[in-house]
From Swiss-Prot:
One Pfam family of this chain: SecA_DEAD
EC number, UniProt record: 7.4.2.8
Subunit (UniProt): Monomer and homodimer. Part of the essential Sec protein translocation apparatus which comprises SecA, SecYEG and auxiliary proteins SecDF-YajC and YidC.
Functional description taken from the UniProt entry: Part of the Sec protein translocase complex. Interacts with the SecYEG preprotein conducting channel. Has a central role in coupling the hydrolysis of ATP to the transfer of proteins into and across the cell membrane, serving both as a receptor for the preprotein-SecB complex and as an ATP-driven molecular motor driving the stepwise translocation of polypeptide chains across the membrane.
Gene that this sequence comes from: secA
A GO cellular component entry from the record: cytosol
This protein's name: Protein translocase subunit SecA
Membrane topology qualifier: Peripheral membrane protein
């Protein structure tokens, strides 16, 4: 019986079909302009760009220009690339222009589709970012599609790893910029650590098209981009704790693979306490006393490293380094490190050099970075399974674009075996059969370990001619993928390694020409060889087609249906024939974790013999149900993490906007004066409470506070003895003295140097305190979950306490800036020119090796204003005049004669 919803869909079509149908008339209008565009000369076609820009300047809307602009790009692509976008590609381009996700199957020409909305939106002059997953694709697409933009008078830039700031600035200044998601995010963070607006490289976030949008906005959504600086060396502690884990028995801990957690049992806790006592690392009466918080953190990391993280699956060891493997793509991520000491725990486990732990200087998630764009769009072959997440988090609709030719791939039911060994025997048999008839085979695995195990099995069975595509060999992955469609080719790939490069039946002629002919000079000989290669590729294509097209053979189901669909989608591109099949066993991770016991019992009742498989649509449905559960759980995790990250993101936006205002400000004297007044008001309120009697006033505390923060030794203890004096009188006297001292200093420095000094100190102090604040938020986040046990909502508690921490940070900023500006002095050879610009924040700060404190945090910030800072001998320092002290070390005795260290006396401003 057909449901009412099903009946309505039959009559009216689905919402997706209606949306595509609504765009069809515009595709026809673009088609109607084709002959007119073909009649134009190259120069006249290029002249359309200036014509469109003039119309925009005169008040036209981008939507008004869509039809003629798309027609121009279609003709330019035909002339420059020999490629003419189909009508379905025009529709895909319209969807991207509308700020939605275009789901287009593999081989449907997503790279070409992007040129249509990119050109249209680049006409505004605000810049368009095209985001790819790796440097290879960014370079390839910028070079390839840049020919179309260049033909039409637009500039194209590309951002890849290793570029200088000047090169990045030039690339972002282009009309169209191709870049990886990582480079974009890191450039944004680095820009917000610069000290001059002119040093920044990005120029705004107007419009971005994200290629492989599911990979970037879903799979990597939980991974924050972090810029960090090293803390002190704790390698000995990591190694010691690692030895403890090796002494534990299985009864000492519990591992939940589903939740990815590992915890100590009571027996384990007792054993660990004894080990810590022996190593003199235990404090208090219990492991979970507050004194042991840091040790517990290290223990938990070491347990996770040994019981949840597997070598060659989650990471590999290369050149004495632990390198993370992306769980979704199987690619290595050199330079990426797990945070909070987990990476150091893995290094201790693998007995490689332990790198220093890092302190976060700046961080952002892809979720929050990409939500900054005024308009965001995306392309992928598989987005519909995550449509709810795209809608809820990014406000993006998913629109399935029809294929140009019908998909003729056959997706066969899964074959399920009882054991892994039986499954692998069946896989080897299947590969041999397909190879014998000349069918190209892509074998999908879930980890490097499994891909290499299968490779070894094939070698033992006499199959030696195959390629492995995984994180160990990703340098060659584009070429390997491009030739995986040759008849009888066997390619073993982890997850979606090689995404972004089509598998063409018979191989890719252009890549073969590039590989085989390289830099061979143009001429008759090269032409003849190119022709021979193209003819050979065509012959091989016909042979592969006759054998049934590409066979995608998957060795396991992934947690996400989307990853499975991506793997299937490698076959059957542009109407080619193909087939796909999954080979599973009850011992596979997904089956084992999500309840295969019942299924095992059923298969035994059915009398399933060794090497026999069960093939039934019911199995597929059961697995899909398990995958939906995992997807829903992962979505909930990401959604929940985003709620917490939004708290930090709101604060980040305030701080980063404030930095830009400070950098742009010509004169900060008003801002600095307000900060100084706030500090005075706070001191008076703290030491002279409202409505308190004079004898209750803390004159001594106020005097010390004024000396500490304002560098003024005022007779406050005498003032309070005066008859009828009120708190407002004291406030006014302090304010008058402070303003006078500040004005004298400004006059001595001159306006140029004073402006530079104020800007430098405010910016560097803000950066320092923001970094400390990030650490405090991390600590708060790690413990806030326990509030749930007290029947309080952890998120609300986090919001409330994070706000209090932020307010405290702003208070500390006012105090630190005031204290430093009231002490800063110049020791210089020439006063004519201001000092050179301060170095970038990442290099400007040095952490004290013994205390872990930042050298510039307090007194040393004053050296920013010095063209030639010097250390003054003790006998030349006047204890009552800090201007004679010169550079004072943080751990030196304070020159004022208090007997305290400088950092605990006049150096305690921050």
């Amino acid at each position: 019986m057909v449901s009412l919803g099903g009946l309505a869909r039959k009559i009216f079509g689905s919402s997706n079909e209606r949306r595509v149908r609504a765009l069809q008339p515009r595709a026809e209008q673009i088609g109607a302009l084709e002959k007119e565009m073909q009649a134009l000369s190259d120069e006249a076609l290029r002249g359309k760009t200036d014509e469109f820009r003039k119309k925009l300047a005169d008040g036209a809307d981008l939507d008004d220009l869509l039809v003629p602009a798309f027609a121009v790009v279609r003709e330019a692509a035909r002339r420059v690339l020999g490629l003419r976008p189909f009508d379905v590609q025009l529709i895909g381009g319209m969807v991207l222009h509308q700020g939605a996700i275009a789901e287009m199957k593999t081989g449907e020409g997503k790279t070409l589709v992007a040129t249509l909305p990119v050109y249209l939106n680049a006409l505004t002059g605000k810049g368009v970012h095209v985001v790819t997953v790796n440097d290879y694709l960014a370079r390839r697409d910028a070079e390839w599609m840049g020919r179309v933009y260049g033909f039409l008078g637009l500039t194209t830039g590309v951002i890849v790893h290793g570029l200088s700031d000047e090169e990045r600035r030039a690339a972002y200044a282009c009309d169209v910029t191709y870049a990886t998601n990582n480079e974009l995010g890191f450039d944004y963070l680095r820009d917000n650590m610069k000290y001059e607006r002119a040093q920044m490289v990005q120029r705004g976030h107007a419009y971005a098209i994200v290629d492989e949008v599911d990979s970037i906005l879903v799979d990597e959504a939980r991974t924050p981009l972090i810029i960090s600086g090293p803390l002190d060396d704790r390698s000995e502690l990591y190694n010691t704790i690692d030895t403890f884990i090796l002494k534990l028995e299985p009864a000492d801990y519990e591992v939940d693979e589903k939740q990815r957690t590992a915890t100590f049992t009571e027996e384990g806790t007792e054993k660990v306490e004894n080990l810590l006592r022996e190593a003199n690392l235990f404090k208090g009466d219990s492991l979970y006393d507050v004194e042991n918080v840091a040790i517990v953190h290290h223990l938990n990391n070491a347990l996770k490293a040994h019981r949840l993280f597997q070598r060659d699956k989650d990471y590999i060891v290369r050149n004495d380094e632990v390198i993370i493997i992306d769980e979704f793509t199987g690619r290595m991520m050199p330079g990426r490190r797990y945070s909070d000491g987990l990476h150091q725990a893995l290094e201790a486990k693998e007995h490689v050099k332990i790198q220093p732990e890092n302190q976060t200087l700046a961080s952002i998630t892809f979720q929050n970075y990409f939500r900054m764009y005024g308009k965001l769009a995306g392309m992928t072959g598989t987005a519909s399974t995550e449509a709810e997440e795209f809608g809820n988090i990014y406000g993006l609709d998913v629109v399935e674009i029809p294929t140009n030719l019908p998909v003729s791939r056959i997706d066969e039911d899964d074959e399920v075996y009882r054991t892994v060994e039986e499954k692998y025997r069946a896989i080897v048999r299947e590969i041999k059969e397909a190879r014998e008839k000349g069918q190209p085979i892509l074998v999908g695995t879930t980890s490097i370990e499994k891909s290499e195990y299968l490779a070894e099995r094939l070698r033992k069975d006499g199959l030696k001619d195959f390629e492995i595509l995984n994180a160990r060999h990703h340098e060659r992955e584009a070429y390997i993928v491009s030739q995986a469609g040759k008849p009888g080719a066997i390619t073993i790939a982890t997850n979606m390694a090689g995404r972004g490069t089509d598998i063409q039946l018979g191989g890719n002629a252009d890549m073969r020409i590039h590989q085989e002919l390289g830099d061979m000079p143009a001429g008759p000989e090269r032409d003849a060889k190119e022709k021979a290669i193209r003819e050979d590729v065509q012959r091989l294509k016909e042979k592969a087609l006759a054998a049934g097209g590409l066979y995608v053979l998957a060795t396991e189901r992934h947690e996400s249906r989307r990853i499975d669909n991506q793997l299937r989608g490698r076959s059957g591109r542009q109407g080619d024939p193909g087939r796909s099949k999954f080979f599973l066993s009850l011992q596979d991770d997904l089956m084992r974790i999500f309840g295969s016991d019942r299924m095992d019992g059923m298969l035994q009742k059915l009398g399933l013999k060794e090497d026999e498989a069960i093939v039934h649509p019911w199995i597929n449905k059961a697995l899909e149900k398990a995958q939906k559960k995992v997807e829903a759980r992962n979505f909930d995790i990401r959604k929940n993490l985003l709620k917490y990250d939004d708290v930090m993101n709101d604060q980040r936006k305030v701080v980063f906007e404030q930095r830009i205002e400070l950098m742009d400000g010509e004169n900060l004297s008003e801002t600095v004066a307000e900060m100084r007044q706030d500090v005075i008001d706070d001191l008076v309120e703290r030491h002279i409470p409202a409505n308190a009697y004079a004898e209750q006033w803390d004159a001594k505390g106020l005097k010390e506070g004024v000396l500490q923060y304002l560098n003024l030794d005022l007779p406050i203890d005498e003032w309070v003895k005066e008859e009828g004096i009120a708190e407002d009188d004291i406030r006014e006297r302090i304010t008058e003295a402070a303003n006078k001292a500040a004005a004298e200093r400004a006059e001595r420095f001159g306006p140029d140097i004073m402006t530079y000094v104020e800007k430098s100190i405010v910016l560097q102090t803000l950066d320092h305190l923001w970094r400390e604040h990030l650490v405090n938020l991390d600590h708060l986040r790690s413990v806030i979950g326990f509030r749930g046990y007290a029947q309080r909502d952890p998120l609300n508690e986090y919001k409330s306490e994070a706000f209090e921490l932020f307010q405290a940070m702003l208070g500390n900023l006012r105090q630190a800036v005031t204290a430093q500006l009231m002490r800063v002095e110049l020791v210089r050879e020439a006063a004519e020119a201001p000092p050179p610009p301060a170095p970038p924040a990442m290099q400007a700060h040095h952490l004290d090796a013994t205390t872990g404190e930042d050298e510039f945090a307090n007194g040393d910030t004053m050296t920013l204003a010095r063209a030639d800072a010097r250390i003054v001998p003790a006998e030349q320092r006047d204890p009552n005049d800090p201007s004679t002290w010169g550079k004072v070390g943080r751990n030196e005795a304070c020159p004022c004669g208090s007997g305290k260290k400088y950092k605990h006396c006049h150096g305690t401003f921050a």
